[in-house]
Regions:
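N-terminal secretion targeting segments of exported proteins
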Residues: 1-58, 184
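...with weaker cross-activation on analogous glycine-rich loops/strands in unrelated enzymes
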Residues: 2-8, 14-16, 35, 102-162
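Catalytic cysteine-centered active-site loop
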Residues: 53, 73-125, 135-136, 177-178
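Catalytic alpha/beta core of large soluble enzyme barrels
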Residues: 161-171
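Short, low-complexity, Pro/Ser/Thr/Gly-rich segments in the mature regions of secreted, periplasmic
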Residues: 175-184
Length: 184
């Protein structure tokens, strides 16, 4: 098929498709009945998501996506905030949030005091999640911070895996979960 014939055929198909969709829209075919599409103002306001939460959710997704670029980056306790060659848990969260204009304190304990409390059941992507784990843990003190990545997963760094994604609802992370904070 030569280029001219191909182009003519493509234009004909495109024009026919456009005319067909226009006819469907003009007749109302493929749309919901008026009664089904009518929604009271009260129902809309009760179920609506505020612009702030949509923006925060979008920023949370951006924070997590940016953090995923560092998967496998090694862990070092007390890591300097001036390098991305290695992180500890709180320098990692501090670094990835700073890219999106959120200035977090340096330590996981200090980070656990900013923002507002949020239940585990109401976590949104980008929320900070805190644990009492490791040799310094007593079950009540914050020793670790992660970022909620959605679908029951956390993005964080610790030990030999370095920056990694873990399941919040199993193993050590389920047992040592303390609380969560929303900073977006």
């Amino acid at each position: 098929m030569n280029k001219q014939h191909w182009f003519k055929q493509a234009m004909t198909i495109g024009l026919c498709t456009t005319i067909g969709f226009s006819a469907l829209l003009a007749t109302g075919a493929g749309t919901a009945p008026a009664a089904a599409s009518a929604v009271s103002a009260d129902a809309v306001s009760a179920d609506s998501v505020s612009a702030d939460s949509v923006s925060a959710s979008s920023t949370g997704s951006k924070v997590v996506s940016f953090g995923k670029k560092y998967l496998g980056t090694r862990y070092q306790f007390g890591a300097s905030t001036s390098t991305t060659r290695y992180f500890d848990c709180s320098s990692f969260t501090q670094y990835i949030f700073k890219k999106y204009g959120v200035d977090l304190p340096r330590t996981s304990v200090a980070q656990s005091k900013v923002g507002k409390s949020v239940s585990k059941a109401n976590l949104r992507v980008g929320d900070l999640v805190f644990f009492s784990s490791g040799s310094r843990a007593n079950g009540k003190n914050v020793t670790h911070v992660a970022v909620y990545a959605g679908n029951g997963k956390i993005l964080h760094t610790y030990g030999s895996p370095g920056v990694t994604i873990s399941d919040l609802n199993s193993g050590n992370w389920k047992k040592t979960y303390l609380k969560s904070r929303r900073v977006l």
